[in-house]
């Protein structure tokens, strides 16, 4: 009865006018909570349950979609206005109109994406031609004809790639978690360069803006001890996208073990973006302890590579196999290079298997057993100065020469003057990038190069300096929203990374100084085996130094300990190092004096030349005066 009265009272409240006074409820109902969750397991995928009132639809920002729309506008402008200047004006006007309508962002209409729009325009033209051909054909046409058209569309992407059109890929120089570096030859000028390719996943506006900003920062680095920058551009690439409704087929693909992964495996760190502060060393093999640097040489001679099952192929009829590119006349590209350039591989942790094979059998193992879908991602290409000799190679060669010396107290093969010159140029380069507000975060001998006959130091591989492009856990802002050089992500190579990097705490430019301390030790302390090197470099974290180094190089040993202090605030800065006694010892003073003497001799010779010219001019004038008097 009470429930019926409450229902009557509720109806009276709903139907009563403004002057009615609402009576208190007879039952105290609990406060309203969130809407109940409904079981949607039996709802077809094409039907979506409406949980909220209808709202005005919004247009989510998708860079790939907006770039395609901008390319369509530019294509239409060229079709309807043959004059290039007027076509450009029409295109700008259309972009402004779409921006005002909220359909486009001004960001996607910028000139930085002109190469991508050119790629789209060519693909659109080819697509229109293919569509016309398809309409003119018999509707009952064989499916092989459609597959050939699709294969040509994929081939078109390779033909419109600036990287494939302008450069000949010769060798891979290095690979890490942030991209691969290739040695290439420019087809026009015949010169050799290094090109780094970085796959940008999830191309949002924020990510693209960071990429462009960081590229401009790297382009502004002009210093004798920094690897030279030439240009950069962005291209579209296919990325394998597995279908969830098909059975997975594993595909082994060629993958060279990177330098960073090798160092991580030595330290017992898993191959991911984070590293651990606990370092575990592998036991030496019972046959013999591996010599320092021998692993690289043996791998190169035997062409031993590492295969990783990191690609998932699922059966579908959506895309033609990229191996057909080779059959359709793309000469000069191996199967592995086509897969790498056109279909950057997508790692699947559940199917990851590793096995060792040889390079000759790579093409036999790369087989597309099924068909796949593809997603478009952006690939950043950075063209740089080619430096093939790294400081790591130099140290390995020096250590090989030094094994014939038994007396460690002498160590003539260390070449103190050369090592000091290398370290001084390295510190000058680090001082420059720190003044530019950049923290390298991965300084190690493999990322330091010696260029030219005078072996000038060049700092390269700024991949980790741009980690905030690809990593979400990097903190570049403070509470005021201003950019600061303080970071919290665990990046770097474990033997050279500072304690704060390995612990994942905040770090700054002083982390690079720790890495410099480790490099300084390697320059003045030779190692016979890799195990010995790992033990000594790890001992730096507790202040341990080889006694032979303390006796031979007391000044260097002193600054190695200063640079590798656990408290980052107690480490010297780059400018403090340059002004220290480290570069003011007797050997350096003699070298500096010799350089000054050479410069003074050149200056004296130039002055003598000028005096001779002046005396000749004076003699000519005197002869003229004498002739006039006569």
UniProtKB/Swiss-Prot annotation:
Q: To which species is this protein native?
A: Homo sapiens
Known regulation of its activity is: In normal conditions, the protein kinase activity is inhibited; inhibition is relieved by various stress conditions. Inhibited by heme: in presence of heme, forms a disulfide-linked inactive homodimer. Heme depletion relieves inhibition and stimulates kinase activity by autophosphorylation. Inhibited by the heme metabolites biliverdin and bilirubin. Induced by oxidative stress generated by arsenite treatment. Binding of nitric oxide (NO) to the heme iron in the N-terminal heme-binding domain activates the kinase activity, while binding of carbon monoxide (CO) suppresses kinase activity.
Q: State the residue spans of region: Disordered.
A: 1-40, 259-301
Known function: Metabolic-stress sensing protein kinase that phosphorylates the alpha subunit of eukaryotic translation initiation factor 2 (EIF2S1/eIF-2-alpha) in response to various stress conditions. Key activator of the integrated stress response (ISR) required for adaptation to various stress, such as heme deficiency, oxidative stress, osmotic shock, mitochondrial dysfunction and heat shock.
* Positions of the catalytic residues: 442 (proton acceptor)
- Gene3D superfamilies in the record, alphabetically? Phosphorylase Kinase, domain 1, Transferase(Phosphotransferase) domain 1
* UniProt name for this protein: Eukaryotic translation initiation factor 2-alpha kinase 1
Record-annotated site: Heme-binding:
80
Noted disease association is: Leukoencephalopathy, motor delay, spasticity, and dysarthria syndrome: A disorder characterized by delayed motor development, speech delay with dysarthria, hypertonia, progressive spasticity, hyperreflexia, and bradykinesia. Cognition is normal. Patients manifest anxiety and attention deficit-hyperactivity disorder.
Family stated for the protein in its record:
Belongs to the protein kinase superfamily. Ser/Thr protein kinase family. GCN2 subfamily.
What EC number(s) has UniProt assigned to this enzyme? 2.7.11.1
